[in-house]
Amino acid sequence: MSLTMCVMEFGAVRLFFNLFLVVVACGVGTAGAQSYYEPERGTATRSALMDAIRPHVEWDLGQPIEFVVNDLRVSGDVAFASLAPQRPGGTPIDLRDTPWYRRNWDPNSDFMDFMDGTHTEALYRRMRDTWVAVHFAIGATDVWYAWDEFCPEYRSVIPEWCK
């Protein structure tokens, strides 16, 4: 085989290999594409999601509540939120001064040691035109929303937890 033929074959192999890499990269990019979006501040969707969880959090932590949104994801009719409740103006919430604490206080219990403060996660479902906070936890120390019972329905908004 001549040197020219070898160079041409090498060029064809290299071209094929480069095309293969492009196809694989595009396929991986598509397969791993994000399936959710974050509603922008001030949108009706974001407000509706905060309004859906607010009564639950106020029942446990008292009124009034503001949320620092750490993560908010929507995909179709499901959503996920990771929130940090606080009092207006950024005042932290003292768990010992909440309705939840007064309802559950036990001098023989150290349950406060097993909480992650007021950090709140919620899983939502849109029913007709209304967002409903179907599952939520305040102060959870585990990734409860990645349990097998939730993943089939909420995988699109928490794909990193639902493999």
Can you say where each PLM-predicted feature lies in the sequence?
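Short, non-transmembrane alpha-helical segments in secretory-pathway proteins
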Residues: 35-64
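Mature extracytoplasmic domains of secretory-pathway proteins
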Residues: 70-119, 125-126
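Surface-exposed patches in mature extracellular/periplasmic domains of secreted proteins
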Residues: 64-72, 134-136
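Bacterial N-terminal signal peptides
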Residues: 16-27
